[in-house]
Design a protein with these regions (language model features):
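Conserved N-terminal beta1-alpha1 strand-loop-helix module at the mouth
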Residues: 1-62, 68-70, 85-86
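Active-site-adjacent beta->alpha loops and helix N-cap segments on the catalytic face
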Residues: 2, 40-56, 69-74, 91-105, ...
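Conserved beta-strand positions in the central sheet of alpha/beta enzyme cores
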Residues: 15, 35-37, 61, 81, ...
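Short, acidic/polar
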Residues: 17-29, 73-79, 117-127
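Structural motif
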Residues: 30-31, 83-84, 103, 128-129, ...
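Short alpha-helix boundary/capping motifs
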Residues: 55-56, 108-109, 128
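Histidine-centered beta-alpha loop that forms part of the nucleotide-sugar donor binding/catalytic region
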Residues: 65, 112
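Structural recognition of alpha->loop->beta junctions
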Residues: 78-90, 124-135
Length: 152
């Protein structure tokens, strides 16, 4: 698989997360942003949102859990693959990450690390679905994030 997503993250680890059209417009105009996480939209608008990002030369990652009108089943990943030019998906659901990998999309497993049980769940899911990246939230946990980095 092409490694441009990994290269983009390595070159500039600051990733823009857009939640509305105003954020999208600003993000697309910034040259130093290479990867964009799409955290909004609906089944009718996601194609155009992704296209704006792609037209600005950036990597487009769709958070499929946050797109209105789409289900939480694996078919949502097929929909994104078939109907947009998205480079990959973000999800909190391991089954969707697994489907994204099957479709040769880049994947980010988003995880809320709230306690030791959640930490163990990350270990299990990471081994089962092998996402390209794991996004740990909340992002104010440097020691725990360091541990997650070492295990992956």
């Amino acid at each position: 698989m092409n490694s441009f997503f990994h290269e983009a993250v390595e070159e500039n680890p600051i990733i823009a997360a857009v939640k509305n059209m105003d954020d999208l417009k600003i993000c697309c105009s910034l040259e130093d942003i290479r990867v964009v996480f799409i955290l909004f939209g609906d089944v009718c608008s996601i194609r155009e949102i992704v296209q704006q990002i792609k037209d600005s030369g950036k990597v487009a990652m769709v958070h499929v859990d946050l797109i209105s009108g789409l289900s939480s089943k694996e078919i949502v990943v097929d929909f994104i693959r078939k109907n947009t030019e998205a480079d990959g998906i973000i999800s909190t659901k391991a089954a969707l990450i697994k489907r994204g990998k099957e479709l040769k999309m880049f994947t980010v497993l988003r995880y809320f690390l709230l306690d030791s049980m959640a930490y163990e769940n990350i270990r299990q899911q990471q081994h089962a679905v092998k996402p390209d990246y794991i996004e740990v939230l909340p992002g104010v946990m440097p020691k725990v994030i360091g541990k997650v980095c070492k295990m992956s």
